[in-house]
Amino acid sequence: MVFDPRTLDNPKEISAYRDQRYQGTVRDQETALRTSCTLYVGNLSYYTKEDQVYELFGRAGDVRRVIMGLDRFKKTPCGFCFVEYYTREDAELALQNISNTRMDDRVIRADWDAGFIEGRQYGRGKHGGQVRDEYRKDYDPERGGYNRAIAQKGGDRQ
């Protein structure tokens, strides 16, 4: 049986990830998610390179492009990317077979995205990276160490 997200009764089951700044109605966003060829990929190491993402996600089909997430101030990788495929079917294969696998010793997560728009490659946290990293309390060397608030206090070694 092939998974077809266009037949779901509950649109929230389509994607746990939602762009909070989506310009449009919830219904528009749900329609875009049901027909999109774009995946949001999170929990990447800050050291993961674009060619690594192409190589892994290319196993599922023809990748149109990869857009690496960047710290909006430093313009350095900040742990996420968007992967665009030419077809929905290839994106579905990637979602089914690559999400929750390891890349650079990290379990990555992929989910549907409504479609990349210029500017979304930049982190939205107040320090320029991802918001989720600003709430992280543990030390994570693959994602910049401590979050910046803890780092400014000298680290939380508990």
UniProtKB/Swiss-Prot annotation:
It is found in: Nucleus. Disruption phenotype: Lethality in 98.7% of embryos. Residues 123-158 are annotated as: Disordered. MRNA binds at residues 17, 40, 109-113, 120-124, 130-131. Residues 130-145 have a biased composition (Basic and acidic residues). GO terms for biological process: miRNA-mediated post-transcriptional gene silencing; mRNA 3'-end processing; mRNA cis splicing, via spliceosome; mRNA export from nucleus; mRNA splicing, via spliceosome; mRNA transcription by RNA polymerase II; nuclear-transcribed mRNA catabolic process; primary miRNA processing. Residues 37-115 form the RRM domain. Its main location: nucleus. InterPro entries: NCBP2, NCBP2_RRM, Nucleotide-bd_a/b_plait_sf, RBD_domain_sf, RRM_dom. Transmembrane segments: none annotated. GO terms for molecular function: RNA cap binding. PROSITE patterns: RRM. One of its GO terms (cellular component) is nucleus. SUPFAM superfamilies: RNA-binding domain, RBD (SSF54928). Keywords: mRNA processing, mRNA splicing, Nucleus, RNA-binding, RNA-mediated gene silencing. SMART domains: RRM. Belongs to the RRM NCBP2 family. Component of the nuclear cap-binding complex (CBC), a heterodimer composed of ncbp-1 and ncbp-2 that interacts with m7GpppG-capped RNA. Component of the cap-binding complex (CBC), which binds co-transcriptionally to the 5' cap of pre-mRNAs and is involved in various processes such as pre-mRNA splicing and RNA-mediated gene silencing (RNAi). The CBC complex is involved in miRNA-mediated RNA interference and is required for primary microRNAs (miRNAs) processing. In the CBC complex, ncbp-2 recognizes and binds capped RNAs (m7GpppG-capped RNA) but requires ncbp-1 to stabilize the movement of its N-terminal loop and lock the CBC into a high affinity cap-binding state with the cap structure. This is Nuclear cap-binding protein subunit 2. It comes from Caenorhabditis elegans.
